[in-house]
């Protein structure tokens, strides 16, 4: 039987989450709800709306960011977020700066790895971890360990849903 989805509006704007009730198992947990963030991850209009909400929630005003590390398939949202955070008209300490958008690469052992040509985007940089959702924190922990391994500094953690 296919789960029945409900739309739940989130805060302000056009962003809504599709939620299904039931029993769902992930690698790290069991949950009673499945939150589908596919539209926010792949539709530019919804990605821009999600990025706008994230940027307005104090990410832009108080957090210096050099690199956005996009995890869980959030690269489209990360690109939109970098654009919002660097806009001159938006109240942001990142206005006019360059922000790199980097997606995760998972090695055969499950660790996050980056090629030599991408390391400069992490080493000594202020990094924002961007995730689709946070339930147990294990993905966040992997992201933090990766940033520390590449000698970056975790500036913050943002999720579409937590």
Predicted regions, residues:
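N-terminal start-of-chain detector that recognizes signal peptides
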Residues: 3-8, 98-101, 126, 130-132
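Nucleotide donor/acceptor-binding cores
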Residues: 28, 66, 124-126
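Sequence-level detector for tyrosine residue identity
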Residues: 6, 28, 33, 100, ...
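PRPP/pyrophosphate-binding module of the type I phosphoribosyltransferase fold
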Residues: 92, 105-162
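Conserved PRPP/pyrophosphate-binding segment of the phosphoribosyltransferase/PRPP-pathway fold
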Residues: 40-119
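Active-site-facing substrate-recognition patch
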Residues: 1-64
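Long, contiguous hydrophobic alpha-helical segments, chiefly transmembrane helices and signal peptides
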Residues: 23-25, 33-38, 50, 71, ...
């Amino acid at each position: 039987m296919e789960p029945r989805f409900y739309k739940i509006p989130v805060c302000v704007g056009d962003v809504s989450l599709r939620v299904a009730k039931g029993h769902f198992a992930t690698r790290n947990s069991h949950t009673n709800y499945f939150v589908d963030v596919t539209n926010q991850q792949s539709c530019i209009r919804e990605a821009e709306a999600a990025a706008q909400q994230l940027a307005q929630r104090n990410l832009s005003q108080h957090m210096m960011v050099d690199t956005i590390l996009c995890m869980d398939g959030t690269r489209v949202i990360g690109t939109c977020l970098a654009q919002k955070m660097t806009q001159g008209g938006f109240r942001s300490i990142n206005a006019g700066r360059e922000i790199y958008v980097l997606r995760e690469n998972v090695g055969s052992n499950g660790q996050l790895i980056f090629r030599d040509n991408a390391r400069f985007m992490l080493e000594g940089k202020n990094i924002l971890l961007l995730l689709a959702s946070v339930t147990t924190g294990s993905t966040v922990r992997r992201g933090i360990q990766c940033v520390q391994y590449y000698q970056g500094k975790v500036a913050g953690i943002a999720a579409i849903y937590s």
